[in-house]
Design a protein with these regions (language model features):
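Conserved donor NDP-sugar-binding/catalytic core segment of glycosyltransferases
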Residues: 95, 99-129
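Glycine-rich, basic loop-to-helix element that forms the pyrophosphate-binding segment
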Residues: 65-82
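Short beta-strand/loop segment that forms part of the nucleotide-sugar
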Residues: 34-42, 64-67
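Short aromatic/hydrophobic "clamp" motif used to bind/position activated sugar donors
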Residues: 87
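Conserved nucleotide-sugar donor-binding catalytic segment
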Residues: 134-216
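Cell-envelope/extracellular polymer assembly enzymes that use nucleotide-activated donors
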Residues: 4-7, 35, 174
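A conserved acidic beta->alpha catalytic loop
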Residues: 32, 40-49, 91
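N-proximal low-complexity "stem/linker" segments adjacent to membrane-targeting elements
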Residues: 1-28
Length: 251
């Protein structure tokens, strides 16, 4: 294992429209002790050509391209290849802020399991909204930070055998919850770590996908009354999706 501090993992599949912006945000980081691994799922567009452009500019970029079982399978491949002490998962249509990784490392301690911060939500009309991460204690029933707004110790991801592929949309929540329940030590910084485009799979309302929250709470025994907590969270999600989001789009 090398002494690289942060391994940035980006899963791609036909991501050419947005990938260049994501990779540029990595290059523009004030924090420079990183590697960036692109895990591609046999893209049919020019995703790999873009990746190779960045590899030619900077040896810290590298990639693999092979069939996978979805984004969390790609994420698992990524951490297994990673050489860094910390793992950061960046969406292929998202950006890490210029000082994002520096801000996280500024609050790092030897005992920390996860370092996390806030985010900017970027909407399809180009507008953005600052979104504060939830307190870590809420990890028992919801994903307190977005996975793009946090870094996790690689040793803990390995200890938990990575992402559970039974979860198509909430595997990041499942893994992060397991780490929280077993190891604790989530450290927060009130800084924006990422800019996230609000068009991803986890941002689309699909009740079957939301049921994964109930399944993982039961699996991890994270709350005393999982069904009650599930409906409490889902009510808030419904209000946000059907009332608050349309109001934002009308502004």
């Amino acid at each position: 294992m090398s002494n690289i501090k942060i391994s940035i993992i980006i899963a791609t599949f036909n991501s050419a429209k947005t990938l260049r912006v994501a990779l540029n945000s990595v290059m523009l980081q004030t924090f420079q002790d990183w590697e960036c691994i692109v895990v591609d799922g046999l893209s049919k567009d020019n995703t790999l050509e873009i990746v190779k452009e960045f590899e030619a500019k900077d040896v810290r970029f590298h990639h693999i391209s092979e069939a996978d079982k979805g984004i969390y399978d790609a994420f698992n491949k990524g951490w297994k290849l990673a050489k860094g002490e910390w793992i950061y998962y960046l969406g292929s249509d998202d950006q890490v802020t210029k000082n994002g990784l520096t801000d996280l490392m500024d609050v790092s301690t030897s005992e920390a399991s996860v370092l996390y911060g806030d985010m900017y939500a970027i909407f399809e009309d180009g507008s953005e909204r600052y979104v504060k991460a939830h307190p870590a204690k809420q990890m028992t029933y919801l994903m307190a930070p977005s996975h793009q707004g946090m870094i996790t110790r690689r040793t803990l991801i390995e200890a938990e055998n990575g992402f559970d592929l039974q979860f198509r949309v909430r595997a990041d929540f499942d893994l992060t919850q397991r780490i929280y329940l077993k190891y604790g030590n989530f450290i927060y910084t009130p800084k924006a770590i990422t800019k996230c485009l609000q068009t991803g799979l986890s941002n689309q309302f699909n009740f079957k996908h939301h049921l994964e929250r109930l399944t993982l709470m039961r699996k991890n025994n994270s709350v005393r009354f999982p069904l009650l907590m599930f409906w409490y969270v889902e009510w808030k999600v419904l209000v946000r999706h059907w009332i608050l989001k349309p109001l934002h789009l009308r502004k």
